Amino acid sequence: ITCGQVTGSLAPXIPFLRTG
């Protein structure tokens, strides 16, 4: 699991909706 730019979460790294 890679944490790029998350959308729907204010904390990176957290894989909610990854766009990167």
Curated annotation (Swiss-Prot):
Molecular function terms from GO: lipid binding
Keywords: Allergen, Lipid-binding, Transport
Family from the record: Belongs to the plant LTP family.
Role this protein plays: Plant non-specific lipid-transfer proteins transfer phospholipids as well as galactolipids across membranes. May play a role in wax or cutin deposition in the cell walls of expanding epidermal cells and certain secretory tissues.
Protein name: Non-specific lipid-transfer protein
Gene source species: Citrus limon (Lemon)
